[in-house]
Structures are given as structure tokens and as C-alpha cells.
Amino acid sequence: MSRTDPHQPLLSVRGLTRTWDGVHGCHDVSFDLFPGEVLCVVGESGSGKSTLLQAVSWQAAPESGSVRYDTREQGLVDLATLSDARLRLLARTDWGFVRQNARDGLRMRVSAGANIAERLMAVGGRHYGELREVAGTWMEKMELDLGRLDDAPASFSGGMQQRLQIARNLVTHPRLVFMDEPTASLDVSVQARLLDLLRRLVADLGLAAII
């Protein structure tokens, strides 16, 4: 059973610093993120937004500071104390990470359905029929044509690829999703549609998100 307390932060960051050259990146960042809350990180290109997301999600360990996450089993835990295996488990189950370029977050040569089902298989899903059904449900949630379930993402438009990547990340019902400028590479009209879809999904699923 989850120990999540709605009055306790899901994520607590204190004094976080991470740079890529000793100068540029993020410096002394502190914030709390509560269940169901959305935090938008705003800044110019190269200002350190992606670096911050990588440090908070422990894809790149910070140079200083701490990141604590409210795990289901132990409550707030400092990510620095977790093993690589435990961090990988969190990334597969409780977290999602939507990358700016959808091609970096998808397997481009396997089917759309397999991309979604693969994440379910990583947490124990094995029944082919059930996996396919859930994948189809998420295709429809993301306003993707169910008839494209067996098509490879390489044949999709950029906007479709991004929606597929989001489905792949949300299918395991994570509590926290990191989104690294998910609309930056899309046309303005596609951006608006995707942002509206994201707003509805975050509200419907009660996700916490950093965008």
C-alpha cells in the first residue's frame, strides 16, 4: 500500500547544483512538489532546464544538494542513498520521463503497441492479449489511430511520435513525470493541441509533473 501523504511533498529538492562545465547549469535550486502539482521550469535555451531535470531525476547526479522522493514503501528517501537497481525500478514504475525529441524516448523500429506494452512488461505484464488491449486503450487516449497500433513510430509524424512517447510513459500510472520541453520540436499548431491533451491527462490521472 502506498504511504503517500497528500500533505507531504512527493519530491523535495534542496540546494541542488549541477553544471556541465563548472559554470553553466543550475545552481542552489530548492523546491517542494506535492502530489498532483505541476511545476513549470521557464528559461531561455541553454539556461539549464534540461540539466535541472536530469539532476532531479538522478539521470545525472548533482554536484551538491539533495533530492528526496516519497517512495511507496519508505516515505521520503534521499535518492543518493538508493542503489542503481532501486533507481531503475523507480524510473520504470513511479516515474516517467518524456524527452524533447520523441525519437530518444521510443524504440523506432518496433510497433507503436510494443512501445507501450514494453513498459508494462518491465513491471510484470506477460499476457499478450491484455498488453495489446491496454496499448490500444492508450493509443485512443492519446488521440492516435488504433489502426496504427502495429505500425513502427518511424512512420509517424513528430506530433504522433510525441503522443506515443507520452503513452509509453503513462501506461504504468507513474506518480511523477518529468517532461523535457515536450513540445519544443513541434509546429505551433501541434504544440497547442499536445499541451491541451497533457493538461487533461495530468488532471484526470492526478499526476505530479515537472515541465
Question: How does the language model describe each region?
Answer:
Residues 57:
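Helix-to-loop junction immediately C-terminal to a conserved catalytic motif
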Residues 130-147:
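Conserved ABC ATPase "signature" region
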Residues 65-78:
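Conserved ABC transporter NBD signature motif
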Residues 152-156, 160:
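Conserved ABC ATPase signature
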Residues 75-96, 122:
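ABC ATPase NBD coupling module
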Residues 42-44:
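The feature captures the beta-strand-to-loop junction immediately N-terminal to the Walker
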